[in-house]
Amino acid sequence: MWMKIQRVKTVIYSVSLLVAASSLPIANAAEKLQTTLRVGTYFRAGHVPDGMVLAQGWVTYHGSHSGFRVWSDEQKAGNTPTVLLLSGQQDPRHHIQVRLEGEGWQPDTVSGRGAILRTAADNASFSVVVDGNQEVPADTWTLDFKACALAQEDT
């Protein structure tokens, strides 16, 4: 059972010399899911290597839970649940393929969407990284994902 779904949307800018950095904190109350996404600075158009970190995310929930899930409904690429295909805002033919990853995170093979982390810890972090070596044109990229805390499983 899923609970406390929170949606996070941010923009990744790729231009010849500059990429904007942003931080997007959402929610504050003790029993509410909190999500934060920080986009890295100075991402250049051109060659980007596999594994390059584009953003770092955090999910926090202080209530009873058995883990976290992060996914995107709109940007899923292919059959790998953790891989997303971002389209450029200036030119929708521009693409960059990214993946969600982090220590302990696994592809959610049950639903086929996103990454899941089984933990009772209140906090978890994940990264958005480049998936494969790519040549990326200058454009603006929107990263749109959802996060939730997983309900305690009945034993």
Where are the regions a protein language model picked out?
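Generic alpha-helix detector with strongest preference for long hydrophobic helices that associate
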Residues: 10, 38, 109, 119-122, ...
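Compositionally biased, intrinsically disordered low-complexity regions enriched in proline and serine
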Residues: 14, 43, 62, 95-96, ...
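N-terminal small/polar-rich segments of proteins
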Residues: 26-90, 123-136, 140-142, 146-155
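Mid-chain, structured segments of secreted extracytoplasmic proteins
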Residues: 73-119
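Bacterial N-terminal signal peptides that target proteins for export
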Residues: 2-14
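N-terminal signal peptide c-region/cleavage motif recognized by signal peptidases
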Residues: 20, 24-25
